[in-house]
Amino acid sequence: MKIWYVASEAAPFMKTGGLADVVGSLPQAVAGLGEEVSVVMPKYGSIAEAYVDEMEYLFDLIVPVGWRKQFGAVLKLERDGITYYFIDNEYYFKRDGVLYGHFDDAERFAFFSRAVLEMIGKMEDVPDVLHCHDWQTGILPAFLRIHYQHIEAYQRIRTVYTIHNLQYQGIFPEEILGELLQFGPEHFTAEGIQHNGLVNYMKAGIVHSDQITTVSPSYRDEIMEPYYGEGLDGALRYRAVDVRGILNGIDLATNDPNTDQRIAETYNLDTYKEGKVVNKRALQERLGLEVRDDVMLIGFVSRLVDQKGLDLINGVREELGQLPCQFAFLGSGQPEYEGIVHEMTAAHPGKVGSYIGFDIELAHLIYAGSDAFLMPSRFEPCGLSQLISMRYGTLPIVRETGGLRDTVKPYNEFTQEGTGFGFMNYNAHEMLATIEKAIRVFYEKENWHALVHQAMTADYSWKQSAKQYRELYHLFA
């Protein structure tokens, strides 16, 4: 079966978040099961030159963009048994700064989605499945169904649409309906791609794809309800029989403390006690923390946005500063949350360290050098950081929501089982109590090391998830 993964980013070529990690890892896992796999993404101007040098030009495209025709080109790169296709258009994709948030994002990703479909018309091997990801490719299943179903070559193609984060929906003015998408008014309805009087690319994917997935079973259930549904819970409930939750994995080769060259000292299950101490000291020195082996160090690596629980941290930040532990923050995002981290760092020198921005080496050092890892998310579709931290022997402290609930087993003091610590309600003092519990267990060394052992030996690979995706694809066979 030929499966194309269509996404706006994929590691290692371009990454702004977890989407790129998934599209970088899942195709390899599915290919390992014997499927013929390709990935299609834009050719951004900021892709590293080393990768660009490996790309092979295939052919040009003329892509309908409303009443206009836009030029594009398709390039190809083979890597680790996967064929990567890159859609090139310098006007849309050779821009400085961030990938998203441009004034013409509706047009940029409409162009990309139609370019993928136009590209298929020039290929000898037509894909059986187009697996689209998040709002940036949500319009593709709608294009396929509305503009291409009359063409025989496209009639057997089926679509899978994965929701990585329902909060980001790709919402645009009604005017693009005809001018850009070339859809008639019959599609601008509550049953179609309209939501609150606007065109919604995420909803287009939900309405027009053949199957829908989310990135964890619990998140799948949560988004059926208004609290988590971001206004689209009704559309999701209507398609509920076609929606399934399949848990993300992580790339075990990239995230391996035994081979990770980004950390101060590598370690494994037998040597983690010594290895983590070396990394802890390096992390403390890097962030200006007091260098102490005996104090618990709690890491935090995340986008600093409302989803990630920064308001809980802010609500008890004075109490956190008085705890017998240290904090290491890494991330960037909304100015008000960056300010909270700055203020905590200034108020508690030697106890709170931070870096505003993103540094992949520092991120890995936090995973390796911390004792615990804080993720108090308001919602979390899956989360990858908790999986990485457990693989590195760093126990997560999480709010039990979405993928965090599915992946972190809270500590049971009676059975000594668990891989981390959890709290249920989105409440600052409940989070604080859970951190205090983790600190107590940290000093019960036998119990703590038993938890670390369980965390490091759990399976965080794509193996089981890839099998579930393969079963989903073969529903169409």
UniProtKB/Swiss-Prot annotation:
One GO-annotated biological process of the protein: glycogen biosynthetic process
Single GO MF descriptor: alpha-1,4-glucan glucosyltransferase (ADP-glucose donor) activity
Keywords: Glycogen biosynthesis, Glycosyltransferase, Transferase
Annotated metabolic or biological route of this protein: Glycan biosynthesis; glycogen biosynthesis
Pfam families: Glyco_transf_5, Glycos_transf_1
Binding site for ADP-alpha-D-glucose: 15
Record field: catalytic activity: [(1->4)-alpha-D-glucosyl](n) + ADP-alpha-D-glucose = [(1->4)-alpha-D-glucosyl](n+1) + ADP + H(+)
Top EC class, one word: transferase
Residues that span the membrane, as ranges: none
UniProt KW Nucleotide-binding keyword: no
Entries under SUPFAM superfamilies matching the protein: UDP-Glycosyltransferase/glycogen phosphorylase
Protein EC: 2.4.1.21
Gene3D superfamilies hit by this protein: Glycogen Phosphorylase B
Function: Synthesizes alpha-1,4-glucan chains using ADP-glucose.
HAMAP family given in the database record: Glycogen_synth
Stated name of the protein: Glycogen synthase
Organism: Exiguobacterium sp. (strain ATCC BAA-1283 / AT1b)
Gene name, Swiss-Prot/TrEMBL: glgA
